Each structure stands twice: as C-alpha cells, then as structure tokens.
C-alpha cells in the first residue's frame, strides 16, 4: 500500500505560514519524506516541494531544519531517477544547489554524507549546473570545510563514479586554492594533492600532466609544493617544462576579456575558450568535459580554462594583508593625473596613473588596456553613427541562445572603435552615442553569459581610461548597473564590475554623487560591494583630498569629508572580516590625508575596533607620528560592567524623577540608554493625554525638538550601550507577561503604556545629556552608534523592530532629521518583515506621503501592494501625487515580471521568497491599481510595450482565478489606449495566448492581398453566425442546406428591454444590398464578445428573382443544368419568403433606419464587379437553416448497424448515387429509411482530407504577401484577360518575368474563384496546365537563376498548391530537392520557402503514401550518391511525413525494416543536423508503430512493434532515450 500523497501547495502553506506551529510543520515534512522514499512523486509538483523545503531548512528549529534537508536530499534522488531529461532539477538548481553545498560544511558527519550523495545524484541529471555551482559557491565559500568537502567530492567522482571525468574546468580554481592556502590549511593541501595524484595517475590522463605544471608556473606556486605534487604523480617538473614549451603562433586569433577570451576569425566566429597568456595546447583544446555516461549526448561541450595575469578574477574575495603596502616608503607620492596616451602607429594604449593608486588596485586587477584588440578608425561622424547603429539592433528584446553570440561580437567591435580615432577626433559625438546606447551596453554587462559580461565590463573600463573627464556624463547611465553587478554570486562578474568601477573612479572628475554611491554600496547587505567600497574610497581620497570641492559643503551641508567619515564608520564596524581589513587599510589612507579628522574618528569607535586599527598600523608610522589619541584610547581603563552601569543609572534616575516635567520628550535622539519600567501611577496619569494628542494630528503643538548633537563622552556611550539592549528587552518581556496575565486589558492601553515609558526615559536621558554637555563638548555631530532608531531597526527580533518603527513614525511626523542609514534598514525590513511597516503605511495620508522619502519607489510600491488590500481611488491619487509616471510604470512592470519569472530577480533570495509568498496578492493589487490609474497617468509607447508584454504572460496564471474579470477589463482598456501597439505586441506571443487575448478584447485580423490592409472584425464568429427564425421552418429543404458553418441560438436578453419580436429584429437588419452591420461595443450587461455581435445578410426581391439559377447551382453544388421543375419550385418558395419579409419590414422601419450597414465596397468577402453580382444569392442560403434537433433525434433512433458483404460494396450503383444527390426531396425521404453503418473490412483508414490554408499564420509566404500588399497601388485593378495571362505565362517560361509581371501572375492565381466566367472556364480547361508548364520551364537549369527569382517562382508554385490545383508530383519533388542542395544554410530564406512548399504538399493534395514512397526512394539513392542530394532537407521531410496521422495506417513490418535500412546509415553521420533528423525520424516511426499496433486487432499484423524493439536494441542508451523523447512530441 502506497503512502499518502502530500499536496505541494498544502505543504507550502503550512511551512510558510507564521501561524502554523512547529509540530504541524514537522509532521507534514515527515509525511512527505515517507512518500518520497516509498513512492514516485508527481513531477509537476516538484518545484512547489522545493520552494517549501527551501523555506523549511532556514527555520530556526533544529529538528525541522534537519528533516527538511533530509527530505530535500531524498527528493533530489527520486526526481533524478524519474525525470530522464533532467529539466526539473536544472530549473530548480538556483534554490537547491546552494542549500546542498552549504551542508557540505555541516558539523554532523551524517549531514555531510547526505549532501555529497544528493550532489552526486544532482550531477547525473544536471552536470553543468552542479559544476558551475562548485566553482562559484563551494570554491569561494568562507567555510573551509565546504572547500575541503568539494575537493573530496571531485576525487570521489573520479575514483568511484566516472574515471573519464575531466577536471580541466576546475584546474585554475584548484591551483588558486593551492596558492592561497599553501601555508595555512594543511588539510586542504593534502586533499588537493590526493586529487591530482588520483586524476593524473590514470592512464588516459597522463598526457595532460604538463597542463598542471604550466598552471603551477602561471600562478607562481611555491617550488616546494610544486615539486612535491609532481613527484607524487611520477614526472619531474623539468621534463614537464620542456613539454609545456609554448609553440609561438599556435593561437594568435583571440580576443581577450580578462580571464576569458573568445577565438574569432575576422570577427566572423565566436568560439568561446578561456586561456592563459601562453597558447593553448592542442590536447587540451580538443578535450571534452566528461559527463555521466547516461547523459553524454545531452551535456558534452568543449571547455578549457587557464588563468591569465588577471587571475584574481576567479578567486575568492581577496584578503588584504594587515600591513598596508603603499606606506612602505617614508614619503607619500603626490597623486598624478591619469593620462591615456594613444600611439597612432600601434594598437597599444598607454595609461599612466599615480603609483599610490596603482598600489591600491594592484591586488585586484590589471589597469593596463589589453593590446589584443586592433583599433577601428572611422572616416567621419556619419561613419561613426552608422557603425554604432548597425551594432545596436541585436540588443533589442531579451537575451536568447541565438543572439548572445552576436551581441558579444558587437561589444568586441565597440572595444575596437573606442581604441580608434573616434575617441580623439569625435569625442563629443562618441560620448553622445554611448549615452544613447547605454541600455544596450548594460544588457551585455549584466548578461549571465560570462564572456559577454566580461567584454562589457572591459569595454566600460577602456572607455573610462581613454575618455577620462569626458566619461563624466556617462556615470549615471552605467555606474548603477555596475554596482548592482558587484553583488553577483558569480565572482568573475563581480570582479569585472569592480574593475570597471575602479577605472571610472580613477579617471572621472570629482562629484559628490560618486561618494554618495560609495556610501550606498557600503550599506549593501552583500559582502562584496561593501568590500569594494573601501577600495573606491581610497582612490577618491588619494585623488581629491587636497581639492576645494572635496571639502566644500553643498546645499545639503555635507562635504566629501563628512561622507568619507560615514563610510569609514560603517565599514570599520562591519561583521565581515574581509570588509574590516579593507576598512582598516582605508582608515590609514584617510589618516595620511586628514590626520586630525582621523584622530577624532577614533574617539567614536569601539575599543576593539581601535585595537584592531592599531594592530594594522603600517610600518612607516612610528610612535612619533602615530595618532595622539590612539595610545590613550587603547590604554584606557576598561568600561564598567553591565551591573555597575545599571546601578549608576538607577541612582541617576531616582534623583531626576522628582524634577521630570510632564511633557513629550524633546528628542529620542539624545538617548544613550534604553528605558526601564516606571511606576504605574505615572503611566496612568500621563500616557493617555499624550497619545490622544498625537493621534489627532496636532503633533506640532508638542514642541518637538530637532536632533541635537550628542554630548556624551566616549566612555559614557560605551558604558551604556549594553544596558540599552538589556533594559529594552526587560521592558518588552514585562509587557508581554502582563498581557498574558490579564487578557481583558485593552490593546490600545498597552501601546500607550509603552509609548509613555519611552517618553519618560527620553526625558531622563535628555537631562542626563544636558549634564554631560556641561562636562564635555567633544562631539559636534550626531553619533549614530547611540541612535535608538538605528539600533531597533537593525535588530533581528521583531519586538525591537516594532519599537523602532513606532519611534520612526513619530520622528517622521515631527519632521526630525534622520540618518540616511534608515533607508537601508527599511529596505531590509520591507523584504523580510513587511508586516511591521503597517504603522507607516496604514495611518494617515500625510504620514504615507512622508514615508515615501525613505524608500525607492519600487520597494514602496511593492509594500503597498502587499499591505494595502483594497486599492481605491484615494490610494491611486496619493501614489500619483508623490511619484513620477516613469517610476510607477517601471515598478509595476518589474513586479509583474518577478511574479511571472523568478529568474528576473538577481541575487536576492529574500525578495524571491517574498514574491513566492505574496504572488497572488501583488498581481491583484497591480491589476486593480492599473485599472484605475491608466485613466489618470499617461503612458509612453515604450512603457506600454513593456507593460502589455508582461501582462500577456499573466494570462495563463489568472485565467482560472477570480482576478480574470478585472484582468480582462485591464486588457480592454489597454487596447483602447493604443490598438496598434497592442496588436503588434500580441503577435509575438504564443498562439494559444494570442487567441485568448484576441477573444477578450475583440480582435480578428484578416489579411486581404487585393486591398493591401487588414480589416478588423469584433470576433471570428461575426462572419459565421446564423440566427434561426420561426419563418425559416416554412422554407423548403433547398433553402436550409446542411453545410452551414455555425449555428448559434438567439440571445433573447439582447431584446428583452425593448420588447421587440426576434423575427422583427432580424428583418430590421435587412438592406437592399448584401452587407455586414457594424458590431456594437461592449456595454451594459453584455460581457461576452459573442453577445455583442450580430450580422445579417438579406437579398432584395430583384436580386433573388434574377439569379435563381445561379442560386440553385451554388446551393446544391451539383450539375450546372438543373431541371425546370426544380427552378420553378425554388421561385415559388422564394416569393413566399419575400412576402413575409415585406409584412415584417412595415413594423420595423424605424429600427432598420437606425442600424448602420457597411457597403459592399467595405466587405472583404465580396468582390465588386459585374460578373460577381450573380453570386450574391449564395450568401442568402447561409441564413436559411432551421432547427433540426428533433430530426436528428429521430434519425439516431432509427440507427441500424448492418454489415454489408464485399460484393454489395463493390456493386454500388453510381447513377443511383447521382440521382439521390440531385433529388431535392431526398433529405425528407431519408427520414423513413434506416441508417446503415458500414464496417470497412478491406480499407485501411479514411479518405484523406484537404486542409484549408490560413493567410493569417505567421510564415514566410504570408509575410511576402503582406509586403506585396503594402507596395500595391490602391487604384490597381485586375482585368482578367486571357491574352494577357498567356503573355505573362510566356514571359515566365522564358525567364523574362520581372517584378510587376510577377505580381500580376500572382493576382491571377489568387482571384481565380472570383474572376469572370470566361476566364474561369479557360483556366479550368487549359490555363492551369499552361501556368504549370511555364513554371517548370522557369525552373529548368535553376542553378543559374538568382535567388530572388527562385523565391518568386516558389511563391507562384505555393499559390498553385494553395489553390489545390494538382501539379506533377515527381517534378515538384525533384525541384525541391534540387533547390535545397543550393541553399547555403538550413535557416536562410530559400530553405524556408522550400520547407513551406513541402508543407503544402502534405496538406492533402497528394496522397501521403505516394509522398512517403517517393522520399524513401530518394533516400535509398542518397545512400549511394550522397554528394548529389541535400540530406538534411530530405530527412526533415521524412520526419514531417512520419508525423502525419495517415502514416500510422500505412505502417507494416516491411515498411519499418525498409525505413531502418535507409536511416541506419546516417545514424553516426558527421553533421549534427543529419543526426538530429535521423533521431527525430526514428522517434516519429516509433510513435506511428505504437499507434498502428493499438488500432490493429489481427495478431499477425501487430508484429511491427516487435520489429521496432529489435531496432532499438541495436542502438546505444543515449540514442534510445532521444528516440523515446521524440516519440512523445
């Protein structure tokens, strides 16, 4: 008995819900574990399981966290067995792999073992993702255990799993670890030695030993370590050095991008490699990464990596030495202004910078510009503009597998342009073009493709070095994207961004916004930008410390010096040791430039920080010139204990208690200690009046004090810091206890008690601060370390954060000065604990507006969507009043893109989890906001396109939810704003989604070549609806043919309000000419697009009586000469019907006058000429259908199943069939006859149905027609002259036909059905064969025809096939095969045209069996004469034929064996496309054989499936899996 299946959504709700207890979570997780271990899991629910478990592993409860990881490990193993494609695990690698790799460093051995087993199972399904994660996460992990275990895991894979596994990808990183830890981590060194020994001792890896030796020399591994490892392998390093001597000139053709370079051939190929300064050995470049054997064909790819001189880009975050190297000299060098000198006779660009700055960045990257790229000169400004504009179109839209290579080539070309003469001769124009194209370049910089991103970063670095101060206008366009990239998890990308930013800071002139950006980076939650911010600050200090602008206080009264102190204060107290090390180096740089300010800064720092700074003192700073306060601060008495501080503070409070006045505290900013509980009498006496005043909005009367500088001494601050947290914690816990003991206490009273406590203690603190002010006045600025708001908001406990939010609320209302650090803390809270922000967002409108200044609008809008559940007009007006239009639409678009694709969230796991939890709430809020906001906020075309594109992705998500009605209203509103842009974006989405949206908004585009434009109808039902009336029951069977396209019941509610008879309503829509009534817009209660449309076509008496003969011929579709009795009977019926019409028209004249009718000239389905007027009665018959449901019931009641003999089937009288078909009363007479159902015992399958062609499908042929329709003259008329047609055919046959003549021939072919009668008869008799023969003559010796004429001929040929006119199959097939051999690529225009022509062959005009036999014959000849055939095209055709339903009726054992004999010879072909087509054909053949086997009842006939089994047994496992995959498509 299988275990209970756990619902993924239910598990997610339990785990993510804050109200669920730990027991329920643990129980649910254990149930899932039992299910996963025993039974198969539902693959579709795996992503939701992973999301739930990723939340559960972070729960503080140890038992839940351990169980969750155990379940996750079992789930990975289970999915790897079930999902042979590996797509599920690949898509979830961003969530699962970081969890597994982090567990490699777990304290428990069992957890580490489980992690390694799970990683191995994951590797079998997603090898590339696992290997990339090991490099990006494991090798740069701060836990040394993780690094060690990852090395051990690699050794396990080589020795126990796959001895052919290649470590070329990991080699540079492993050697880097060896170099960094050669003296510190002996265990890691031994593990690496073991790995190298096990790997290079294998027989097939011995030839690659010299690669290891070369890597050691490149990264300068100590000789003792080098020799010890090489000796273990068994070869001396001297021999390896001889083997590793580079062959100069082996690989000259490369473009360098740091550690990454791209091999190119005149910018024509993109072959990605990663190499060192020396040439790549042939053995290494030809080696491939070995994958798990079961997935070799899926994942093999060539990859080799070796570090260059910029090897720091692939290592862990650099750890700076404690001694600052740049102070080794006794005298500092004056900063020199960087100058980039371009040598016009060489492609090298010399860049000179200050030696001091060079030492700062030396350990991070190489400042020198790469010389491997040749400069590209331009003639003039127009040449520069044209060259850049040619490079930009490829960057439009999203990055895909097919365009990233071209983007990389274009960035390389931009690197050549910046090296050329444009930077000297056209500097301003070049700068302007770079600013306009910033969006495209930033797409390359932030790309997930490492080589593309590297080239983008190097391009910006080179721009800054070459353009220097001219790069300043581009700073705001590029720096934000680079700083965001610094937070990337991929260390190469992060290092490249840091390199580009350093180059910018080195070269651009000073501006305060640069320092502000550094300050923002110093407050980032990611450690990498915080570490880099110290380096950037050093560069700025060295360059601008002696400039007046650096010390100038601008409009915000903040100088560069003040901002530098803020950055240093933040970095020196950073929890990360790497950041603190950089900060200490930065401090000594700051001390060298501003000694007095540096000494003052020391007095504000913690004692431990000061001691750490003392230990990192450079050697050049002796006791004589070190900071004077440094010794005194480090030697001072230790601060008092917590107990002493509490006793002293209580004494002070008792003295001040009697002197405290009843008023609101002047400021909570000067408070340096946390409150402790006052007595209850005081609370009861003073808390309520204070809160009533605040809540009433009269905050200004309380005399709120502005922030005043902190005056407490350094020792006083330090002695009270610990007491702050302790007392506030006691206060909160005390309040919680009171609440539990007395449940009847009002919640508002408790809040007031807490507020009053804060007021009392703030008053006491103010008194204490005034005393301290009299004693000392050292600090002239506010001390952030003592700010209670910052302390509360930076806490991890919700109680403290809540207190901080309340304090911040009243500080905002009082318009107090607040630290800029509040912004970063609020951003963190908005992602992790957004519910705590309710006091700021759900109070008054004034507070709501003021709160906005502390958030970016994206964060502000996201919190609004989550917290505010009702989006009304007031909220929309508030948001519009405080934010810009661009910010609103940009934020809405981003949030929608996050909900549809979590991959759009870059390196923010907290935000990812928030979007997962509140996805539905965010989508609902955005839809409601846009529904109301679009009427008030103008929207530009660019934002309109982005918005509708993202909304289209929501269609499938909201369709079955309650949001769908509002979502449809939003789409209709957007369509009404800009129909053209809406329709163009709609064409880019999937067909199913497009049809859904078209149905919602009422779009139905029909392309008419003769008119040259598209006419829109409300829906596709407009032209096919039939509204039956009571009067139709009296009509003869001739007037109610059975071939109507659609019958829809009358919607009575359309006429209930007017009390109008339905038949009268129908007749009111009649007119003298055939026409369509304009569909009304959606209004009132008519929500369905179908309900809103009605179209009626009624003919006048004159038309009907004049054209009775034509009418009968069209309605019956039989002999053109009917009997006189039939015609007379039809005339009588029509006259009776017209009499009824006349009577009803008298009662509905007023209504018919008000109905708008479209003239025939506007009807794309009616051709305007004299010869076509006689065809109008045919349209009338489509509205003569009566309700025959009772007749159908009667017929089916008389069904009698009989089996006729074969002889009777053969002896069916064709004359009798013809008489029955012509007889107008045959339908009525059939009611009395039994209905026979025949069993086709000797006929396999049903007759093949000819498919109708769709001119609205997006393909090459329709695109050509659309182009011709746009170029066609409006007044061009077609004269269907037989002589002109013959003349055109003669020109076609002699290959002299040109553009206008070609269009004329195409028009003849397209309008055969509506041409005059004389031409129609001629074309049916001899014109068809004439145009066919002309085409064959045209294509004779087609190898000499230009491509444009070949395409024109194929258009005519396909039009013949679309008209369902038979042509010679043999000549047609030979022509397509011959043309396919002349195409240069499988994706060029000629190949598309040929492929579409073959698709039309399969539309039913020719028998599938005949086409099948022709293809097999051609393939059998191709086995012997390969060079004379285009194999990919023929094999693709075979695959298409095998995909048709008719093939399953033809399959038998002999045919399967024949196909196998043909295809087996191409299974191992050198061309990938041929192998793909062969595998695809085998897959379709397997599918067809299974279908054939399932429908056969004769056991002798069902043997072909066993034949397929025999064929599959001959193939390899990967080939079998591929065939199985294609058989399911």
Swiss-Prot record:
InterPro entries: ARM-like, ARM-type_fold, CLASP_N_dom, TOG
Keyword Phosphoprotein found: no
Region Disordered: start-end pairs: 266-314, 617-638, 651-745, 1070-1090
Chief site of localization: cytoplasm
Subcellular location: Cytoplasm, Cytoskeleton; Nucleus; Cytoplasm, Cytoskeleton, Spindle
The entry's keywords: Cell cycle, Cell division, Cytoplasm, Cytoskeleton, Microtubule, Mitosis, Nucleus
Keyword Nucleus appears in the UniProt entry: yes
Annotated Pfam families: CLASP_N (PF12348)
GO annotation (BP), single: cell division
Positions in coiled-coil regions: none
GO molecular function, one term: microtubule binding
Biased composition (Polar residues): 295-308, 619-634, 708-723
Gene3D superfamilies recorded: Leucine-rich Repeat Variant
Biased composition (Low complexity): 273-290, 660-674
One GO term describing the cellular component: cytoplasmic microtubule
Assembly, per entry: Interacts with microtubules.
Family according to the record: Belongs to the CLASP family.
Role, per record: Microtubule binding protein that promotes the stabilization of dynamic microtubules. Required for mitotic spindle formation.
Protein name according to UniProt: Protein STU1
Species in which this protein is naturally found: Debaryomyces hansenii (strain ATCC 36239 / CBS 767 / BCRC 21394 / JCM 1990 / NBRC 0083 / IGC 2968)
Protein encoded by which gene: STU1
């Amino acid at each position: 008995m299988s275990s209970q299946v756990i619902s993924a959504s239910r598990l997610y709700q339990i785990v993510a819900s804050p109200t669920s207890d730990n027991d329920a979570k643990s129980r649910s997780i254990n149930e899932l574990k039992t299910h996963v271990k025993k039974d198969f899991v539902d693959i579709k629910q795996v992503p939701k399981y992973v999301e739930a478990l990723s939340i559960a592993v972070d729960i503080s409860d140890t038992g839940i966290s351990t169980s969750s990881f155990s379940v996750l490990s079992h789930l990975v193993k289970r999915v790897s067995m079930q999902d042979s494609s590996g797509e599920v695990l690949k898509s979830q690698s961003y969530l699962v792999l970081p969890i597994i790799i982090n567990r490699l460093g777990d304290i428990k051995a069992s957890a580490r073992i489980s992690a390694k087993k799970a990683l191995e199972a994951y590797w079998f399904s997603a090898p590339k993702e696992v290997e990339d994660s090991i490099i990006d996460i494991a090798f740069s992990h701060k836990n040394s255990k993780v690094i060690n275990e990852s090395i051990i895991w690699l050794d396990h894979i080589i020795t126990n799993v796959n001895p052919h596994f290649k470590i070329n990808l990991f080699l540079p990183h492993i050697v880097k670890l060896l170099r960094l830890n050669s003296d510190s981590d002996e265990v890691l060194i031994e593990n690496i030695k073991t790995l190298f020994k096990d790997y290079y001792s294998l027989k097939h890896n011995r030839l690659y030993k010299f690669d290891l030796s070369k890597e050691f020399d490149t990264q300068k591994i100590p000789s003792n370590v080098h020799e010890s490892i090489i000796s273990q392998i068994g070869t001396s390093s001297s021999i390896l050095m001889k083997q590793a001597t580079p062959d100069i000139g082996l690989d000259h053709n490369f473009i360098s991008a740091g550690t990454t370079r791209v091999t190119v051939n005149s910018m024509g190929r993109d072959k990605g490699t990663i190499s060192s300064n020396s040439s790549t050995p042939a053995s290494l470049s030809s080696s491939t990464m070995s994958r798990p054997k079961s997935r070799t064909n899926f994942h093999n790819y060539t990859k080799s990596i070796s570090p260059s001189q910029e090897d720091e880009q692939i290592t862990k975050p650099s750890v700076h030495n404690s001694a600052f190297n740049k102070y080794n000299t006794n005298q500092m060098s004056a900063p020199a202004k960087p100058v980039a000198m371009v040598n016009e006779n060489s492609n090298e660009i010399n860049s000179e910078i200050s030696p001091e700055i060079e030492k700062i960045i030396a350990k991070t990257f190489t400042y020198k510009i790469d010389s491997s790229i040749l400069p590209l000169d331009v003639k003039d400004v127009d040449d520069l503009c044209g060259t850049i504009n040619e490079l930009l179109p490829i960057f439009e839209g999203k990055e895909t597998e097919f365009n990233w290579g071209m983007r990389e080539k274009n960035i390389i070309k931009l690197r050549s342009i910046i090296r050329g003469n444009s930077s000297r001769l056209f500097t301003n124009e070049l700068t302007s073009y770079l600013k306009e194209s910033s969006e495209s370049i930033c797409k390359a910089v932030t790309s997930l493709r490492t080589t593309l991103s590297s080239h983008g970063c190097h391009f910006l670095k080179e721009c800054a070095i070459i353009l220097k101060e001219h790069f300043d206008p581009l700073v705001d366009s590029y720096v934000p994207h680079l700083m965001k990239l610094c937070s990337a998890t991929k260390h190469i990308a992060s290092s490249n961004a840091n390199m580009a930013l350093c180059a910018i800071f080195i070269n651009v002139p000073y501006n305060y916004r640069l320092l502000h950006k550094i300050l923002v980076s110093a407050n980032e939650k990611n450690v990498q930008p915080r570490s880099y911010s110290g380096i950037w600050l050093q560069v700025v200090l060295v360059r601008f410390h002696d400039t007046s602008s650096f010390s100038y206080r601008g409009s915000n009264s903040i100088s560069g010096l003040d901002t530098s102190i803020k950055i240093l204060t933040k970095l020196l107290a950073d929890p990360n040791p790497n950041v603190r090390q950089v900060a200490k180096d930065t401090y000594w740089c700051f001390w060298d430039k501003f000694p007095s300010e540096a000494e003052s800064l020391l007095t504000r720092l913690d004692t431990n920080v000061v001691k750490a700074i003392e230990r990192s003192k450079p050697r050049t700073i002796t006791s004589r010139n070190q900071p004077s306060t440094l010794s005194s601060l480090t030697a001072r008495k230790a601060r008092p204990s917590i107990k002493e501080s509490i006793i002293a503070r209580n004494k002070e409070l008792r003295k001040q208690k009697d002197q405290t006045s009843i008023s609101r505290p002047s400021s909570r900013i000067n408070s340096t200690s946390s409150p402790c509980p006052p007595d209850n009498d005081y609370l009861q006496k003073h808390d309520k009046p204070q809160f009533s005043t605040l809540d009433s909005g009269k905050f200004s009367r309380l005399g709120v004090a502005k922030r005043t500088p902190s005056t407490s001494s350094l020792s006083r601050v330090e002695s009270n810091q610990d007491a702050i947290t302790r007392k506030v914690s006691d206060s909160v816990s005390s309040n919680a206890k009171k609440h539990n003991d007395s449940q009847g206490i009002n919640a508002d009273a408790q809040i007031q008690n807490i507020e009053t406590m804060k007021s009392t203690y703030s008053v006491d603190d103010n008194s204490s601060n005034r005393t301290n002010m009299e004693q000392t006045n050292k600090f002239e600025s506010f001390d952030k370390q003592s700010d209670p708001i910052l302390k509360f908001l930076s806490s991890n406990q919700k109680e403290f954060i809540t207190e901080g939010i309340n304090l911040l609320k009243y500080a905002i209302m009082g318009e107090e000065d607040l630290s800029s650090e509040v912004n970063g803390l609020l951003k963190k809270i908005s992602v992790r604990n957004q519910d705590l922000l309710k006091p700021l967002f759900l109070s008054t409108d004034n507070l709501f507006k003021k709160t906005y200044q502390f958030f970016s609008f994206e964060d502000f809008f996201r919190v609004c969507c989550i917290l505010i559940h009702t989006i009304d007009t007031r909220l929309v007006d508030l948001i519009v009043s405080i934010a810009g239009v661009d910010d609103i639409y940009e934020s809405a678009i981003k949030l929608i893109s996050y909900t549809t694709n979590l991959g759009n969230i870059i390196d923010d796991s907290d935000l990812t989890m928030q979007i997962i939890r509140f996805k539905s709430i965010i989508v609902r809020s955005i839809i409601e906001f846009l529904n109301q906001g679009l009427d008030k906020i103008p929207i530009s075309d660019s934002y309109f396109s982005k918005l509708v594109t993202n909304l289209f992705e929501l269609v499938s998500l909201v369709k079955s939810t309650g949001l769908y009605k509002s979502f449809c209203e939003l789409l209709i509103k957007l369509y009404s704003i800009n129909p053209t842009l809406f329709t163009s974006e709609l064409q880019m989405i999937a067909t199913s989604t497009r049809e859904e949206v078209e149905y919602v908004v009422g779009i139905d585009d029909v392309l008419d070549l003769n008119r040259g434009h598209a006419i829109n109808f409300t829906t596709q039902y407009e032209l096919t609806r039939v509204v039956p009336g009571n009067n139709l029951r009296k009509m003869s069977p001739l007037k109610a043919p059975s071939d109507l396209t659609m019958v829809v019941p009358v919607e009575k509610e359309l006429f209930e309000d007017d009390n109008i008879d339905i038949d009268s309503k129908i007749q009111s829509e009649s007119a003298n000419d055939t026409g369509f009534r304009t569909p009304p817009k959606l209004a009132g209660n008519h929500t369905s697009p179908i309900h809103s449309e009605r179209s009626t076509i009624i003919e006048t008496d004159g038309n009907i009586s004049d054209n009775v003969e034509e009418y009968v011929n069209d309605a019956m579709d039989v002999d053109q000469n009917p009997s006189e009795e039939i015609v007379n009977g039809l005339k009588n019926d029509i006259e009776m019907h017209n009499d009824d019409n006349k009577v009803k028209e008298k009662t509905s004249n007023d209504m018919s006058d008000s109905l708008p009718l479209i003239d025939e000239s506007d009807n794309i389905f009616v051709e305007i000429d004299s010869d076509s007027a006689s065809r109008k009665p045919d349209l009338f018959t489509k509205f003569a259908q009566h309700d025959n449901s009772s007749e159908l019931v009667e017929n089916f009641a008389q069904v009698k199943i009989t089996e006729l003999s074969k002889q009777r089937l053969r002896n069916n009288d064709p004359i009798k069939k013809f008489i029955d078909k012509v007889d107008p009363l045959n339908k009525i007479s059939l009611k009395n006859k039994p209905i026979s159902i025949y069993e086709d015992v000797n006929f396999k399958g049903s007759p093949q149905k000819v498919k109708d062609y769709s001119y609205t499908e997006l393909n090459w042929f329709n695109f050509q027609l659309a182009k011709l329709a746009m170029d066609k003259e409006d007044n061009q008329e077609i004269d269907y002259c037989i002589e002109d047609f013959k003349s055109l055919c003669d020109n076609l046959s002699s290959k002299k036909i040109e553009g206008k003549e070609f269009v004329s021939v195409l028009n003849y072919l397209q309008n055969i059905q509506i041409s005059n009668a004389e031409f129609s008869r001629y074309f049916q008799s001899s014109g068809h064969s004439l145009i066919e023969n002309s085409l064959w003559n045209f294509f004779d010796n087609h190898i000499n025809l230009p491509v444009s004429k070949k395409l024109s001929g194929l258009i005519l040929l396909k039009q013949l096939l679309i008209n369902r006119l038979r042509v010679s199959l043999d000549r047609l097939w030979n022509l397509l095969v011959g043309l396919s051999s002349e195409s240069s690529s499988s994706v060029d225009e000629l190949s598309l045209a040929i492929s579409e022509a073959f698709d039309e062959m399969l539309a039913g005009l020719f028998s599938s069996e005949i086409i099948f036999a022709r293809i097999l014959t051609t393939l059998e000849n191709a086995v012997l004469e390969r060079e004379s055939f285009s194999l990919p095209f023929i094999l693709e055709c075979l695959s298409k034929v095998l995909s048709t339903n008719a093939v399953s009726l033809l399959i038998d054992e002999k045919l399967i064996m024949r196909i196998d004999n043909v295809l087996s010879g191409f299974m191992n072909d050198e061309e990938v496309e041929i192998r793909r087509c062969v595998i695809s054909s085998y897959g379709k053949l397997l599918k067809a054989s299974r279908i054939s086997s399932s429908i056969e009842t004769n056991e002798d006939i069902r043997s072909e499936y066993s034949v397929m089994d025999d064929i599959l047994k001959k193939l390899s496992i990967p080939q079998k899996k591929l065939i199985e995959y294609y058989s399911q498509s």
